[in-house]
Amino acid sequence: WATDQDTLVRYLLSLREVPPGRPRIIAIDGRGGSGKTTLAALLQRVIPKTGVLHTDDLAWNEPLFQWDHVLIDALEQLHATGALTLTPPAWRAHGREGHIVIPPGTTTVLVEGTGAGMRAATPLLDAHLWVQTADDVAQERGLRRDIAEGVNGDAVESVRFWHHWMAAERAFFAEDRPWERADVILCGVTLPGLGAGEVAWNGPSTP
């Protein structure tokens, strides 16, 4: 389906009734470089009072895909209090200052990042999007971004990191298979003929 973004938003907000005082929690999952951050920015613009929780922050200095305990802590705090102030244990251990904060009054929280929709988090999510992008496209995007930002060193170091990352990512996805639990599967590339403000996704489920 190709629909305007408002149709997608209405569908996401209709999937589960959320109790008063708690934000709706929507996971945006997919390969590294698939377009998750771009989608999160789009949804944050069109859904009022939306905060974004990046798994890159939760997983900082944790072993790859072994940070489910940090994600669960964050989601349980959002369920219990409607807000979040969290210093992940690896931040303290490695001297990173500050906190991850979702302020009171936030009505929607987008959990954005590879692994956001992992099986362990499913009971705490209200909606789950999977951004589908081919491996080669995701790798090219991710490498271009990381080299430009210098987050994993120079070009040689970035390529080395991505080979390590994608091996761990494939192993995690082979076991967890998050797309099978997704409420929405969305195309992470711009398709020919897609109009401004349109998104390509699998469309609302029908009985």
Give the location of each predicted region.
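Receiver (REC) domain switch/active-site residues of two-component response regulators
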Residues: D56, D126, D183
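NTP-dependent small-molecule kinase module
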Residues: W1-P19, P123, V131, R144-A148, ...
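Conserved nucleotide-sensing/catalytic segment adjacent to the nucleotide-binding pocket
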Residues: G51-V111
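P-loop (Walker A) phosphate-binding loop of NTP-binding proteins
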Residues: R31
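ATP-dependent NMP and nucleoside kinases share a basic, alpha-helical "lid"
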Residues: H99-A148
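Conserved lysine of the Walker
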Residues: K36
